[in-house]
Amino acid sequence: MVRGSNIFRSRYFLAGILLQLVAVFAVQAQKTAKKDTTIILLNDLTVQLQCSQALNDLYNFKFEKAEDNFRSLKQQYRWHPLPYFLMGLIEWWKIMPNTKDTSHDKQFLAYMDSTITIADNLYENYPEYKIEASFFLSAAYGFKGRLYSDEERRNWTKAASSGKDALDYLEESKTKQDLSPELLFGDALFNYFSVWVPENYPALKMILWMFPKGDKALGLKQLKEVSYNAFYTRTEAMVWLMRILNSYENDQPRAFDISRYLHETYPDNPFFHRYYARILYSMGRFTVAEPVCLNILERIDSAQLGYEATSGRYAAFFLGQIYEARKRPEDAKKYYKQCVKFANEIDADESGYALYSLIALGEIAEKEGNKAEAKKYFKEVKKKSGRKDEAFKTAKQRLKKLEKGD
């Protein structure tokens, strides 16, 4: 099993969560005292039918098919932000497998800016579309904030500005409710993380004092409702629910169910594929995890869209652990070395997967009586890790033990 449960978490993930509080689809619903004249294209069944297969194609990484459908939608509704936002969502999922790749940033931001421009026109000039315009304004600003806060971008000024804009539209619609299950998504994330963040990071309480009080239990309930009943936000809600249940709520069985569903429903999505492999591995279900991981590596070898070194690093490490547990050191070494190779390809040689692969290689070399090779691996870990890292401490102890034996 993985040693050190926190070693694989990006320290910038928290920043993404904070932006997410006021970001993704963060518009709450509307309560009306008179006959409702609000128009919601999101609720239009004809449009939903038109988008259904395209959304499936999007999440299954059939981007060209999805783009063709969304372009057709844009021809019909070029005055509405929906098609531009969906085109931007395609670019977002091109980024998701490897956030170190910035080649899609420009196009993604262009679509989000178009969404904002068109939604702002509706917001300012067409009262019947004001609620839906707020939805897209908050969503677009939120996604921009998430991108800017990513580890590879770290543009905190733009991230903060986008987060503030998203918050403004959240505040605009705070008193409104019961319009659409789509619009519960932002409220769900806010309710959950506005409580979770200060509970787990007390130092951030001062930053969050201006936020309304959330409710974690309600947030989870709302997130489940969106994952069951929404159309456009359903899959995004399931992704967040899976991650929350797995990482924060100690409900791995339920997270596993969602992960398996997402992988089986969208088998060509590399993010869902590797997350499924990750949960299988962490649950110790090695018999099932082995072919899943091997399939990831096969897809990388065949250059399948979205399958690259990030997914390979996961799969190779898990296979190394599986074969080491089965006392097959040669196979274990093969995949640990492959994990390190993948990590080097994406400049992630200081990541937990790479460091613990090196430690495992050193331990195997030590068991085989090759002290020189073992020392080489442990020294490499010390060189690439911080002094406070568990990997550094482990490598230091191993080296000390080896030196005593000389």
Predicted regions and their residues:
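"A position-specific structural signal for the A-helix of alpha-solenoid helical repeats
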Residues: 52, 86, 93, 136, ...
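Short coil/linker segments at helix-helix boundaries
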Residues: 33, 38, 43-49, 57-67, ...
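Structural motif corresponding to the intra-repeat A-B loop/turn of tetratricopeptide repeats
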Residues: 60, 94, 144, 194, ...
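Short coil turns that delineate tetratricopeptide repeat
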Residues: 78, 127-128, 178-179, 231-232, ...
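Structural signature of alpha-solenoid helical repeat scaffolds
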Residues: 41-42, 75, 125, 175, ...
